[in-house]
Amino acid sequence: MQKLGFPAMKSLDKPRSLSGSANMYSFSNRKPPDSVSSGSFSNLKLTAEKLVKDQAAMRTDLELANCKLKKSMEHVYALEEKLQNAFNENAKLRVRKKEDEKLWRGLESKFSSTKTLCDQLTETLQHLASQVQDAEKDKGFFETKFSTSSEAIDSLNQQMRDMSLRLDAAKEEITSRDKELEELKLEKQQKEMFYQTERCGTASLIEKKDAVITKLEASAAERKLNIENLNSQLEKVHLELTTKEDEVKDLVSIQEKLEKEKTSVQLSADNCFEKLVSSEQEVKKLDELVQYLVAELTELDKKNLTFKEKFDKLSGLYDTHIMLLQKDRDLALDRAQRSFDNLQGELFRVAATKEALESAGNELNEKIVELQNDKESLISQLSGLRCSTSQTIDKLESEAKGLVSKHADAESAISQLKEEMETLLESVKTSEDKKQELSLKLSSLEMESKEKCEKLQADAQRQVEELETLQKESESHQLQADLLAKEVNQLQTVIEEKGHVILQCNENEKQLNQQIIKDKELLATAETKLAEAKKQYDLMLESKQLELSRHLKELSQRNDQAINEIRRKYDVEKHEIINSEKDKVEKIIKDLSNKFDKELSDCKEESKRQLLTIQEEHSSLILSLREEHESKELNLKAKYDQELRQSQIQAENELKERITALKSEHDAQLKAFKCQYEDDCKKLQEELDLQRKKEERQRALVQLQWKVMSDNPPEEQEVNSNKNYSISKDSRLGGSKRSEHIRVRSDNDNVQDSPFVKAKETPVSKILKKAQNVNAGSVLSIPNPKHHSKVTHREYEVETNNGRVTKRRKTRNTTMFEEPQRRRTRATPKLTPQSIAKGTGMTSHARSANIGDLFSEGSLNPYADDPYAFD
């Protein structure tokens, strides 16, 4: 109740108890009927009945108020449980938030690493795509070259086919010529045989053949022409040699083209190096992005600090709200104390004179109305406080809902990030698969290009060999054709000169032999030159082919080495970049964790210092309040002692005067009141019996209620009202006095916080009873102030356990202690009119049927032992 902002509940109980005790005091302080000369017993009876009715009405009001208090307490306990649950949920949400922040940071680090990896993979893919494009360009270039080479090969094949056709035609001609030569040889043999036969007859025919010499000279001219034809054929051979030299030059040009291709490959390698430089620049850009992410992380840390500051402000506002509630509670208590002090002063003033009793009764009624108004105002304050607490609870619930929604948003964001991570991983896997496919395609293209180059080289070698064989065969055929032509010409000349050259045959034969020798020497020299030229050409072709093959192999090896080196460098740089970025991220994470740990330790130290300062201030305030309270209590005690002394002196004087007046009147009135008194006593005894039965039933119900409300029922703190009332026979002698033994128990310091116990702890009724005894009794019955002591207990503690503020307020009880007296059990004899008459006649301090005494002793007070009553 006190923790949740119901500081006026205790003050509610106090005014009610005050009102009840005031009513009790108003009718218990009334003087006995012997002192009232003008009044009558019937008026007193009516007033007593009215007071009993008022007490019953007040009891019903108290029962309703207690029911309302029970409901409000249940509602308050439910609200406390809700608040505790809300605080627990807030703590859990804070822990979850911290865990989510840690997970978020880990996910952000993973996301950044995956992002960097994805960027690197995209760069590698772009690099591979550029390489693939270059390879495709090279492939197109090689395809164009292959198409040109295939066209050249096709043209060479066509030329070879034409040459083969020509060779076939030449072979056919050679076969036909061979046949003709064989025929000519046969004819020659026949002619030689015939020439040998006719050689004998040449002498006879020399003269005939002189005419043929002219023809032989013509044949010599024809032979010169044949020699010129041979020279022309030699020139043709030289032309063919020049064509072959041109082909060699073409091969040299091809070699130069290959060197140009080598330079282009080197340029591509330079381009790759430039791309590596660009990749390094992109890595620098990635470093800048990492720095930007670090800046964003610092901004998030700042936002977190602002959030913490706002939360601290909210906690400070909550503490100020609690302090205001405490101040309201203290103000209500001070107001109740002031009203209590005013009531005490008014009660002591009312007891001064008989005439002031009526005015005091009216004033008390007015004050009861004021107390009811105060009660209504306090109830309105309580309703306002309840509304404020309900609003704060609604705010806390809305904040909890907001935190839950934020937690749900964070979980959804985390799930989205996980999905994005999965998609990124899938894209990375697909990119890796594409990369592998592209690498396989590149390797297959390289293998195909190598195979095609090897095939082209083999085809070129084959074509060169075929060309060489064809050239050799053509040269051999040409030689054979030349020889055959020469032989045919010689045979023709011989056949033509047969008839003409008979005489000059020997000379001509010698000349012919010399010319044939010369021709043979020339042919031999030409053949040797051709053979040397062929050998040199073959050697040149072989050396150039070997050089070309070596050069191509070296180029391919260099290209492979350059590509491998570029790949290795790229992989090494990539690993270095990844490792450096990982190291940077780890360093940043470590720095951030260290910073957060330091900030947390600083915040904890600051909070501890603030708590210590607050505790010191609180202890100093408590000490100052205690000192002020003790000084006020001392002042009040001094005032109260003075007032008591004055009231005692006045009461003694009044009693002396009244006793002398009452002695004369009492004897006259006793006779008249005997019969009425007996009837009234019987009625009152019957009513007392009924009320005792009712009280026993109510006690049983109250005990059952206590058992239902708590497992450990509190100790009975009720005042036993079952007193044995007796009118002793010693009253006839006038020496006995009726001593009232009021036993007051001091309240324990550790009282339960239930409002029912607090309602019983109000000591106003006890003070009123003591005042009644002072007014009704003699000087001897006035309590000694030495035997009384006032004890006040008021403590206010603030305990902080793990940041939570728990507040305990011990009850403040003001009790009057009296010397303990043993309870004496007396047997109540039956009342008889004679005993009553004797008792009233003999004693100077007459004790007739005083309604105030009856109420004080509990004979007509049905609520003396009731825990919900006013005492």
Swiss-Prot record:
The keyword Nucleus applies. Residues 18-40, 719-728, 831-847 have a biased composition (Polar residues). One of its GO terms (cellular component) is nucleus. Required for chromosome synapsis and normal fidelity of crossing over. Keywords: Cell cycle, Cell division, Coiled coil, Meiosis, Nucleus. Residues 729-741 have a biased composition (Basic and acidic residues). Residues 1-40, 708-741, 778-871 are annotated as: Disordered. It comes from Arabidopsis thaliana. Residues 58-304, 331-608 form a coiled coil. This is Synaptonemal complex protein 1.
